Amino acid sequence: LHLHYPFAGARMLRDLLRQEGHAIGRRQVATLMRRMGIEALYRKPHLSRRHPAHTIYPYLLRDLTIRRPNHVWAADITYIPMRRGFVYLFAILDWASRRVLAWRLSNTLTTDFCLEAVREAITQYGCPEIFNTDQGCQFTSQEFTGLLKDQGIQISMDGKGCWRDNVFVERLWKSIKYEEVYLHAYETVGAAQQGLARYLMFYNQTRPHQALDGQTPDQVYSDHLTTRRTAA
């Protein structure tokens, strides 16, 4: 049942088991879940905990028309569950093309692995005009905001608790988890790294997007770069 309904907690699993004729209580289900090392898979709290001393920047994307790659990049952190435990995934998404530009996995929720990915994306693709994140302490830190400012990038941050302000990253998380992560019980961080690398290559190069008129993120991103070179 957990593999079919990975979002189900002890109460829901109890009710599902009862539908199948099993007389079992919530506490018994919770005990069995602990013994088996499984838990409901959902976005956990405190990934985006604010730091009271850090500056919060305004949200710049409201009513903004975003049609060209490298206009706006968006980034966030999510949990990637494994058979036992979890790791953190940080990814940078080009808003217009939906292309994943860089990503990193980490065992700890620090700023360092986010900075590595940002530097990689800037080195490979240049700088966006605007970089959007939530108000998590990793993104409001002087190290993170300083890196963006040094590159002349405008900083945009979601409203507090407004996940819809970064909706395309949330859709990316859903695709990653339901099309890759929930189908595999990663035994190690290395296995998670390999699985995500394989999926994100598929996501960028092969997976058609309805919002992109059936094109892939790579096609939209590359077409823009080709058009710019031709115009120049």
Ranges and model annotations:
Residues 1-232:
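Charged DNA-binding/catalytic regions of mobile-element recombinases
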